[in-house]
Amino acid sequence: MLKCPERVSVKKKEDIPDLPNLIEIQIKSYKQFLQIGKLAEERENIGLEEVFREIFPIKSYNEATVLEYLSYNLGVPKYSPEECIRRGITYSVTLKVRFRLTDETGIKEEEVYMGTIPLMTDKGTFIINGAERVVVSQVHRSPGINFEQEKHSKGNILFSFRIIPYRGSWLEAIFDINDLIYIHIDRKKRRRKILAITFIRALGYSSDADIIEEFFTIGESSLRSEKDFALLVGRILADNIIDEASSLVYGKAGEKLSTAMLKRMLDAGIASVKIAVDADENHPIIKMLAKDPTDSYEAALKDFYRRLRPGEPATLANARSTIMRLFFDPKRYNLGRVGRYKLNRKLGFSIDDEALSQVTLRKEDVIGALKYLIRLKMGDEKACVDDIDHLANRRVRSVGELIQNQCRSGLARMEKIVRERMNLFDFSSDTLTPGKVVSAKGLASVLKDFFGRSQLSQFMDQTNPVAELTHKRRLSALGPGGLNRERAGFEVRDVHASHYGRICPIETPEGPNIGLITSLSSFAKINEFGFIETPYRIVRDGIVTDEIEYMTADVEEECVIAQASASLDEYNMFTEPVCWVRYAGEAFEADTSTVTHMDVSPKQLVSIVTGLIPFLEHDDANRALMGSNMQRQAVPLLKTEAPVVGTGLECRAAKDSGAIVVAEEDGVVDFVDGYKVVVAAKHNPTIKRTYHLKKFLRSNSGTCINQQPLCAVGDVITKGDVIADGPATDRGELALGKNVLVAFMPWYGYNFEDAIIISEKLIREDAYTSIYIEEFELTARDTKLGKEEITRDIPNVSDEVLANLGEDGIIRIGAEVKPGDILVGKITPKSETELAPEERLLRAIFGEKAADVKDASLTVPPGTEGVVMDVKVFSRKDRLSKSDDELVEEAVHLKDLQKGYKNQVATLKTEYREKLGALLLNEKAPAAIIHRRTAEIVVHEGLLFDQETIERIEQEDLVDLLMPNCEMYEVLKGLLSDYETALQRLEINYKTEVEHIREGDADLDHGVIRQVKVYVASKRKLQVGDKMAGRHGNKGVVSKIVPEADMPYLSNGETVQMILNPLGVPSRMNLGQVLETHLGYAAKTAGIYVKTPVFEGFPEQRIWDMMIEQGLPEDGKSFLYDGKTGERFDNKVVIGYIYMLKLSHLIADKIHARSIGPYSLVTQQPLGGKAQMGGQRFGEMEVWALEAYGVAHMLQEILTVKSDDVSGRTRIYESIVKGENLLRSGTPESFNVLIKEMQGLGLDVRPMVVDA
């Protein structure tokens, strides 16, 4: 069995822990959303279940009818993912929901069909209308509370806070220049500000005394004589002081005590007063109490309502319901668990499960936030403003959450429809059932819209396995509820200290999206709240343990973290007394005794693709960014070759991308061919697992997906072994390019400006040859004029043109085609307008339906040539039009199918019985198993399981068995669930096959009779103009393909395969390519593969030692000889092996010339671009160039008849036909457009003919 090569490394110890599953971010999130495989009562209140529980129950307006949600049930997919791609349909499951409706007639339960939900494939993708798509995770501002500061024009710093809910109105509070705090509700209504004290009163703190008690420490001071005045003058009263007998007010809460007031109180016999110990007259709360226009809860509510809804009558009931709706109704205001967690953590409240379940706002939250804001204002060192770009304040919405939000909006729409239907239903004539009120359209339409149109649902980049993997790990700050690329500033795009180990600082696109679209770091995970976590090893008493702790960005700020490269002895203790650490976002040297944690690996900083760049630490960051992005554009080659110099991530990247086939259990290979591998299970050789290989499929980007087996019959394999290679992989390792012998030298000026010179030998050996597959589709429809027909009888076409078409009008597989060739012959009825007048008259008289047809065949577009590799035909079958022979054949086919289905069911039952026996036979029942419906005890506690009991369990449905939680029963539940799913899948497959035999492809679009897809494969060799690149951002275009004999050669006669410009290294500062060249030369000579992981690779000294061991020059430079003259070049040249990739920017796809094509309607100029068969733009600067030469006639031609002179175009055509050499140009259409535009501005411009 072919296994990936052992790579030599200088790294002493492997990483702890191993990398997590790289597409977990997608799979885990969607699994939690759907909770497939869980029983209804076992489902947690998350995902789809949470949405249903939130929206239901729905009550009618008079509350006489109630619709309750009970549970949902997901079906089994009708087709496999591969079949869905082939048919161009969506890979989905049906969603059925059980509702209970209660009205005056009684209680009715019913299961209602709610449409379909797309299902995620094992690779973390969705198949929508036959195309693989990925839902990109979105990074957005976390719900919760943020404290900010801004500078006023007068120089004062104004502090503010925002409480951002997951859903609902934002609440903002900001200090003004007079130290008063104003509340704003929703940013849109910013001008409607409410004094904070008024808002607090409206929340229920009606008296001034209540408010003072919330914000200050209350103390009681005695008032016996005038000696006590000194202590009390200037203090703030905490409560109203009223003489109960006379109702005389001596002082109000919030007032400053004066000598006169104290004298009056002393005279009235008041013995003590309550004061606010830590308050003074300049305190914001005291200032606001003085400014507050209201003095009671009712007045505050009305004032709040008046400011929020000016012009509407401010009644108490209206005001109360408004404030309740805004902040205290869970349907309209929801902080979410995340928002509550952030808010409680910031304000010092509890973060246990009970506290986190409170999703609406509380009075205590507003009071706590205002207290914190005042502490900020007062300069409290423990209070600090938040950094909104810190990852503690940004969270990730993964696929499950994004779709959950869509489902919520769809069901909210449905809620209105349900209420309307309940209201309008006529109970006298019919009985109301759940099916009559529930509409499935709302949910289906939002899901269809999201997967088809959302900015976050993207057509998967499938150029190579790395592109696919990175696309699933991508994080976007764009999309609904996110940022806008035009308005996003530098701060949000920049690398932040909290990104360490969470978001890759290197991999991001160049251009307008820089920093907004990023990638998850290698070890990063997303926690239950959506925050990105990264792992650290725990350090205890100076010893680095193997215990791992995943930490979010805010928790990490409190820890002292050492680098992964810090040196340790054999006891995992630091060898040095000081080391570099990170603490609170800063890096510095510190004593090792203070260290609490340590990085798990140096590569936890970067993403997977960046981690594939060897010697990354020697490259400039800008070039590393280009290197990361260009690896995703590498085209899978015909002959793959793993890099000699790798980083050790190649195996893992290939495995998790889903490109290769990995063994799911131990066993022995029983059968192998190009299409499948059959493995007999180790524990029971009669149980066989078949791995189907993908053969010559077209990827989203037109490249070829092909898997080849790596094992032979009799090979022993263990779980996790690679049993088949895929595109761009070599023995289970990623192989995007080729190891090429390069020389860094100028050569006759051909490698000017990064151009690349390659040897003809690479072309001859098909080193950089790739296969592209193009899909062409044609449909025959039933039109108003008659049916379209796919046929070989095409009018006015010669037999030579039809030579490759079969009897049915479809091209044969294996035919070589070039532009213009017919792939599928089709004729379509001509419409009346296309007929001559006399023909139309005859038709009108004789009433004959259009008999004349026109050619509507599918032809090969310009620029495409290749071999027809596959043809797929989909058609509907009409039972009435079938012949007797066809019906007999169908019956035989159905009989065979039924027999096969019965055998499969029998095999499955046997397999299941064996597993049940192995688990239960002669084991003691840990607890009783009860039948849910009949309440009968199926298995008594302590009973020994015998064959009869096992058979009884086997016959029952899992839903009907009530089992207590214990280890044995958990395994039993899993077995039962797997068996029922497998049985269901077999039944669906059988029914689908039967349907296909009887009715053909019933899922074709309406009106389509037949659909034909033709796949043309073309071999693309490397040619001049193709773009190539290394892994260090060293890109260039092939400028010349040189005969092998003319290439420079070494003293041993070996020719160089590629020549690169040495000037591409110093200014680009990507020295990684030079080190790779040297190490590649040494490793290739030694016949070994090496890995040089990011930040812990081969030191230079080790590379020189390796080169000396292999007898290579120590400086990596050799004398070369000119292939043309045989003379030696004057100076030594750096030569070695470098891994070069061919990128998907092929010249064959870009080169274009227009012969005939469309014109723009307004300007009458040819359109632009290859897709429109457009012309080349001859712009202003090009006109200057011709003017400089003085070529008047050429200029006149280009600006008139070759462009937009409509009459002149016709005349020049006539001249060419007649053989005249004459140019009579007219007025360019663009001149007329200019005049019309000026007239549109109200200027009276008219061209006038003036006699010469």
UniProtKB/Swiss-Prot annotation:
Swiss-Prot/TrEMBL keywords: DNA-directed RNA polymerase, Nucleotidyltransferase, Transcription, Transferase
Top enzyme category: transferase
GO cellular component, one term: DNA-directed RNA polymerase complex
Keyword Transferase: yes
PROSITE patterns assigned to the protein according to its UniProt record, in alphabetical order: RNA_POL_BETA
Alphabetized InterPro entries for the sequence: DNA-dir_RNA_pol_bsu_ext_1_sf, DNA-dir_RNA_pol_bsu_external_1, DNA-dir_RNA_pol_su2, DNA-dir_RNAP_su2_dom, DNA-dir_RNAP_su2_hyb_sf, RNA_pol_bsu_bac, RNA_pol_bsu_CS, RNA_pol_bsu_protrusion
Catalyzed reactions per annotation: RNA(n) + a ribonucleoside 5'-triphosphate = RNA(n+1) + diphosphate
UniProt GO BP: DNA-templated transcription
Entry EC no(s): 2.7.7.6
GO molecular function: DNA binding; DNA-directed RNA polymerase activity; ribonucleoside binding
SUPFAM superfamilies: beta and beta-prime subunits of DNA dependent RNA-polymerase (SSF64484)
Job description of the protein: DNA-dependent RNA polymerase catalyzes the transcription of DNA into RNA using the four ribonucleoside triphosphates as substrates.
Subunit structure: The RNAP catalytic core consists of 2 alpha, 1 beta, 1 beta' and 1 omega subunit. When a sigma factor is associated with the core the holoenzyme is formed, which can initiate transcription.
Record family assignment: Belongs to the RNA polymerase beta chain family.
Name of the protein this chain belongs to: DNA-directed RNA polymerase subunit beta
Lineage per the UniProt record: Bacteria, Pseudomonadati, Chlamydiota, Chlamydiia, Chlamydiales
